[in-house]
Amino acid sequence: MHGLLLAGLAAALPLGVAGLPARQQSGLSPRGVDINPYRFASMAKYSEHKSTSQMVHSFSYSKDDDYVATATKLVKSTFPNMTFRTVKDHYIGTNGIGHVHFKQTAHGIDIDNADFNVNIGRDGKVFTFGNSFYEGEMPKTNPLTKRDFSDPVKALQGAIKTLKLPVKPQSAKAMPMKEAETFKFEGTSGALSDPMAKLVYIQKDGKLHLTWRVETDVGDNWLLSYVDSKETETVHNVVDYVASADYKVFAWGLNDPTEGQPTMIKDPWNTTGTGSPFTWHGDGQMDYTVTRGNNIAAQDNPSGGEQWENNYRPDSPELSFVYEYSEQMEPDQYKDFAITQLFYTTNTYHDVLYALGFTEEAGNFQMNNNGKGGEGNDFAICNAQDGSGTNNANFATPPDGQNGRMRMYTWTTAQPSRDGDLEAGIVIHEYTHGLSNRLCGGPANSNCLNELEAGGMGEGWGDFYATAIRLKQGDTHDTDYTMGEWAANMKGGIREYPYSTNMQTNPYTYADVQGMDEVHGIGTVWATILYEVLWNLIDEHGMSKNIMPKFVNGAPSDGRNLAMKLVLDGMTLMPCNPNFMQARDAIIDADQALTNGQNKCALMKAFSKRGLGANYKHGKNRVNNFDMPADC
């Protein structure tokens, strides 16, 4: 394999932007579906490590049980009269914690928003768990016996009409799939792939409702619409696999073209650990001379259409991807540079996250999982200069085994226009949606960041990772960072406040979430809290200048990578659709698992400063608590 020469930025990848070029906290595309009125209500419960340790003394274990059997026993003992199935996405994380996920059923039909996740420690005992199982009255009769529900085609028509989807169903035919009561629709137009439907229950307002879960990928939205099984113009709830935001980037360490110049980099996979065993241009079966490999397929998409496989990519038999860029050029004049930049940024981030624990078993994005678990066949499709929009970006995350899809847009906020592919923060923010949606609730369930507060954390994680990666040697606790400033051509960035540990510069506390009804604003609060976490850990452990983390006893040795690792591990512990308090507890539990709780007080100091103190009680009204634990 020839050496790869990238005229990409070898420094730092920035972060993500909220989607609109003004400081209104909104990421809704003008042509998209507003799912806010259809979000599921929060129902998750989480038993953090301390409470779990006290509870499981009375729980019966067998030394012969594997971690899946132990987890199954816990669910059975907690809900002895309920039925459920084991989701086939269990794995043991790089921190030694086993993760097992369960889906509640009724009459053999999934209750789609009723989940139970169990995390098993190295000692074989339950470490933490969470659940949103339905505990109300079950339907007495099996709906499959009387078949007293609508035809799935009517459900598709109802979703299209109610949500005003750009899909034409006139000739739709429901073709049965192998899985019971699951159908693919043929004869439609307007969607990027054939719509699907599956008969499921959902819990809502204390009752179970039988619905058709209608799946439609229309580009700006990839929706799961829960259509009433009888009244098919009633849509109970909607989940969107697509997450939007606005950002810009240059290279690893450089946030955007204002921070440095393009740098020649040779064989970058040699410095990014074991995440890419086939290099960035092979998948174990094929070697490519274009910007495609096991992790990423990067190409332009000026039409904004669904096709990507045969779209234009830079091609170099010598793997010398060296192209010109100037701020005086229009984006279409440097598309080779932009595609190469996007390919470099996403592959580097893939490898960094791999080292931190986003592996094949955890549901990462790869064509060939090389026998290491997970589903495979799901590398990320990354479109540069996508013509389906401007001044934004998005990432669609279906379950493990289906391709993630990133669409990066140009920005018309300056003359000449600017290309979001050159602001690493935007790229990192978007790819982080793939990370969080695969880890929260398990790789097979991409519905676990749909509720408003949980969805806000999905946005906040994107900002957090983009900002953490952007930090530079010489930065201190007093260093502030904005979001999307270059791409949006907006001094101060696109968020309400810059990320800062100074309460005068950024006064956000958890109580501010009370008045918010949009995920990007909530995400800014969550990322503000995590910025405090980041700097407390850097103050304790320092900050490495290396791209990849170094580990001591399984934990990153520097504060930046430790913060990124604990936040990632926390995602794997928390329940489906968590709230801020549950996410806080999961991060503290992640530290307990990784370092035996050495950083508990540094973490709680950060959370307490912003209102999530030791005595905070989650309720309808969010009231700050600034208390530290007694043992700190």
UniProtKB/Swiss-Prot annotation:
Record-level GO cellular component terms: extracellular region
Subcellular locations according to the entry: Secreted
Xref: Pfam families: FTP (PF07504), Peptidase_M36 (PF02128)
Carbohydrate-modified residues: N270
Gene Ontology molecular function terms on file: metalloendopeptidase activity; zinc ion binding
Co-factor note (free text): Binds 1 zinc ion per subunit.
Residues reported to bind Zn(2+): H429, H433
Induction and repression of expression: Expression is strongly increased during growth on protein-rich medium containing keratin.
Residues that make up the propeptide removed upon maturation: 20-244
SUPFAM superfamilies given in the database record: Metalloproteases ('zincins'), catalytic domain
GO BP annotations, alphabetical order: proteolysis
Cofactor: Zn(2+)
Signal peptide: 1-19
Keyword Coiled coil: no
EC number(s) on file: 3.4.24.-
Active site residues of this protein: E430
Keywords recorded for this protein, A-Z: Glycoprotein, Hydrolase, Metal-binding, Metalloprotease, Protease, Secreted, Signal, Virulence, Zinc, Zymogen
Enzymatic class: hydrolase
Domain of life (superkingdom): Eukaryota
Annotated InterPro entries: FTP_domain, Fungal_virulence_M36, Peptidase_M36, Peptidase_M4/M1_CTD_sf
Record family assignment: Belongs to the peptidase M36 family.
PANTHER family associated with the record: EXTRACELLULAR METALLOPROTEINASE MEP
Its job: Secreted metalloproteinase probably acting as a virulence factor.
This protein's name: Extracellular metalloproteinase 2
Gene: MEP2
